[in-house]
UniProtKB/Swiss-Prot annotation:
Involved pathway(s): One-carbon metabolism; tetrahydrofolate interconversion
NCBIfam families registered for this protein in UniProt: PRK10792.1 (NF008058), PRK14186.1 (NF010783)
Tagged with keyword Oxidoreductase: yes
Pfam families tied to this protein: THF_DHG_CYH, THF_DHG_CYH_C
Binding partners and assembly: Homodimer.
Organism: Aliivibrio salmonicida (strain LFI1238)
Purpose of the protein: Catalyzes the oxidation of 5,10-methylenetetrahydrofolate to 5,10-methenyltetrahydrofolate and then the hydrolysis of 5,10-methenyltetrahydrofolate to 10-formyltetrahydrofolate.
Gene3D superfamilies in alphabetical order: Leucine Dehydrogenase, chain A, domain 1 (3.40.50.10860), NAD(P)-binding Rossmann-like Domain (3.40.50.720)
Official protein name in the record: Bifunctional protein FolD
Catalytically driven reaction(s): (6R)-5,10-methylene-5,6,7,8-tetrahydrofolate + NADP(+) = (6R)-5,10-methenyltetrahydrofolate + NADPH; (6R)-5,10-methenyltetrahydrofolate + H2O = (6R)-10-formyltetrahydrofolate + H(+)
Superkingdom: Bacteria
């Protein structure tokens, strides 16, 4: 068996085109374009790259994009004041504060300060809680993007045994909730899990998000399983690889996401979708 490659670049572009068409229709109907505020504190190079891709995506679909590049010396109080201003701004539907924040800032406090109806990253406890109670509003971008990929490839996950490797607040935990909502029997593995191999070998669907290159040997993958690799790891050679041993895993899986070009593009596509959703459902008067 050779796995079908799940093309995240293609699906993300489709999603962005759909959002762009809906924005165009809004403007033609005399409504305002959705607005996204992107806040970057400091000079972290990776964060600058991520923020740049988000701003470009905004422009591509016709959003109003407001950028706030703050110096590393910005205080927590100053950042909270900016968020207060953006919470009250009627032209802004989504507020994104790029993580990680500089040392000394309480990221939980900052994220909880964002209006839950403008929390387009889906990190606010209110939005995570809504998802856990099966009544989601704004959903965490990477897990939402993964569900979109599975849907667009008509992969029926209901009834599958899904194993999520990694329990972060950004991917692992909300991914577990998304898969429960989709009807999976879900196991979440983490650093205290005993016999990880046993769990992987039982899985019909594996989602790996640990940030360690080739962490999951391909031979562990069950024949015909669906493999979603969230990891993005840069080797000394400059090559990007995932958390799963791709070349071996693709000979056993039925579907697999590549790195790069799999899950990554879907995170930004989900952010764009969330911003339009927030505009249409919460802020259109």
């Amino acid at each position: 068996m050779t796995a079908q490659i799940i093309d995240g670049k293609l699906i993300s572009q489709t999603v962005r085109s759909e959002v762009g068409a809906r924005v165009k229709a809004r403007i033609e109907a005399g409504l305002r374009a959705p607005g996204l505020a992107v806040v970057l504190v400091g000079q972290d190079p990776a964060s600058q790259v991520y923020v740049g891709s988000k701003r470009r995506a905004c422009e591509e679909v016709g959003f109003v994009s407001k950028s706030y590049d703050l110096p590393t010396t910005t205080t927590e109080a100053e950042l909270l004041t900016l968020i207060d201003t953006l919470n009250q701004d009627p032209e802004i539907d989504g507020i994104l504060v790029q993580l990680p924040l500089p040392a000394g800032m309480d990221s939980t406090k900052i994220l909880e300060h964002i209006d839950p109806e403008k929390d387009v990253d889906g990190f606010h406890p209110y939005n995570v809680g809504r998802l856990s109670q099966r009544i989601p509003k704004l959903r965490s971008c990477t897990p939402k993007g993964i569900i979109t990929l599975l849907d667009r490839y008509n992969i029926q996950v209901r009834g599958m045994h899904a194993v999520v490797v990694g329990a972060s607040n950004i991917v692992g935990r909300p991914m577990t909730l998304e898969l429960l909502l989709a009807g999976c029997t879900t196991t979440t593995c983490h650093r205290f899990t005993k016999d990880l191999e046993h769990h992987i070998r039982q899985a019909d669907l594996v989602v790996v998000a640990v940030g360690k290159p080739n962490f999951i040997p391909g031979e562990w993958i069950k024949e015909g399983a669906v493999v979603v690799d969230v990891g993005i790891n840069r080797l000394d050679t400059g090559k990007l690889i995932g958390d799963v041993e791709f070349d071996v895993a693709k000979t056993k899986a039925s579907y697999i996401t590549p790195v790069p070009g799999g899950v990554g593009p879907m995170t930004v596509a989900s952010l764009i979708e969330n911003t339009l959703l927030a505009c249409e459902q919460f802020h259109s008067k």
